[in-house]
Amino acid sequence: IAAAGNKKFVMIAGPSSSGKTTFSHRLSIQLAAHGMKPHPIAVDNYFIDRHLTPVDEFGEKNFECLEAIDVEQFNKDMLELLEGKRVEMPVFNFKTGTREYKGDFLQLDKDDILVIEGIHGLNDRLSYALPKESKFKIYLSALTQLNIDEHNRIPTTDGRLIRRIVRDARTRGTSAKETIARWPSVRRGEEQNIF
């Protein structure tokens, strides 16, 4: 990425709780070690307000579809950053279900790079306005296998569910019961939008 010199956007994608955020921060450390100035950005901060979120065929809010993201605002902000403009970055408040602006401004210099992570990171419809040559794409998934014994293992999907339960409780004000209840919808969204 550093050697290419023309990349301004590292687009990271993977299923829910696969380690995208952790990876984006670790990658940022490595990019900084190569003289770049990385700025991690979570696509989740571009969610539309919860009451506007589309519903799936089961009547549940579909947070996994691209239509749950304000794609136009995302592209507007990224293009303005690419042009060197100063942009106020949003933060999605998962407790209130609204996007907020708290005075967090970003402006890119020559050596700056955006490390963007979200389940739709590889979807060209998310970043349709960004020049293709400016993007470097990475897919990742949690493949850590846990074995109960020599013959039985815990599926990686179950490991991701456990990671999501912890994350949702810590950062999104969601109970384990709510996260488990949403998991089938999350899995359907992964099948439709990622795999």
Residue ranges of model-derived segments:
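Walker A (P-loop) phosphate-binding loop of P-loop NTPases
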Residues: 17
